Amino acid sequence: MQKFHVYGQSRLNGEVNISGAKNAALPILFAAILAEEPVKLTNVPELKDIDTTLKILQQLGVVTYRDEQGAVHLDASNINHFVAPYELVKTMRASIWALAPLVSRFKQGQVSLPGGCSIGARPVDLHISGLERLGAKIVLEDGYVKAFVDGQLIGKRIVIEKVSVGATLSIMIAATLAKGITVIENAAREPEITDTAVFLNKMGAKISGAGSDIITIEGVERLGGCEHSIVPDRIETGTFLVAAAISGGRIICKNTKASTLDAVIDKLRDAGAKIEVTENTITLDMQGNRPKAVNIRTEPYPGFPTDMQAQFTLLNMVAEGSSKITETIFENRFMHIPELIRMGGKAEIEGNTAFCHGVEYLSGAEVMATDLRASISLVLAGCIATGETIVDRIYHIDRGYEHIEKKLRGLGAKIERFTEKIVD
């Protein structure tokens, strides 16, 4: 099993190139199932979840390859299989996005009930109910979600019960080939949804309102090919900004969009960071200072993102003062806190709220990653702690951060990946 060995007390300084957003690349890759002509995607990150998605698409009959420049090419013109199998789906909850384009274009699709990270309940109910509203017949059988439609999906007005990025994407993707007009109300507003809509429109879809809470889709008969560049990863950007903030450093994030990170940037400024933005860069300078504690409440976009909660929990554990962190999106998303406490952090958990009390320094320890964002907070903690830190189960990190140790080393971190030999 691979682990990270992190040597502490590094001040992180320098420049880092931000990768394409995994949370946009995944739905866009699945949406390419709709295309009757070849698609070319650039700025697609090299991640375990991307590799899994490409394997699922290949299983369905999509021809895929990466060229020498890193662009991903997809040809879904000869799809001949309509089942996303358990052995691939079990590692990634986003696999449910395969269902909508399959049933929309081919009138049938089966996806194994997905696995993925261990952040509480992430039910597929909203995906299913949305497809049913469009006319799909869905059964749960033998561990699979099986969807069929007689004739064609029919556009409807759909009010999503609880704001959901996944369900918004599923309904929007399915509705592109539905008959008539679909209106999604209480839609999620994340930039990754907007990027997916831009991609679909390039293929010939007629989508308006993405980025607002009402999205309108006028169904079309077919979708063609296109070229598209994935938007920058705002969560990776935020993660590196926090890395500089907790270490007293200065960082320039390049190839990113500050406009998608307003809530995070506001909190970093509250914590004492000096931040300057241009069209595609963000510069953060802590000028050697320790951050100030900031209260956090996670909310759907454009509120503070749940995917930045673990990183700010770490920031608050080494900040001046005490803070309150409220997690409103997912249950069971404080699993990093006991590990940070093992490193000398001080915090109490009460339901969906954590109370953090800043300490001057953390101490290196052996810690275990539990999910993607929790795991990166442990790596960053190791970068600033005294002594050495071993981070176990780093496969979580490989799901969402491209070349993470290379990027951190470029900023001055002392980090090595190693494989622990298992002795019988």
UniProtKB/Swiss-Prot annotation:
Location of the protein in the cell: Cytoplasm
Residues found modified as 2-(S-cysteinyl)pyruvic acid O-phosphothioketal: C117
Keywords annotated in UniProt: Cell cycle, Cell division, Cell shape, Cell wall biogenesis/degradation, Cytoplasm, Peptidoglycan synthesis, Pyruvate, Transferase
Catalytic residues (positions): C117
Binding residues for phosphoenolpyruvate: K22, N23
Superkingdom classification of source: Bacteria
One GO term of the biological process aspect: UDP-N-acetylgalactosamine biosynthetic process
SUPFAM superfamilies on file: EPT/RTPC-like
Protein name: UDP-N-acetylglucosamine 1-carboxyvinyltransferase
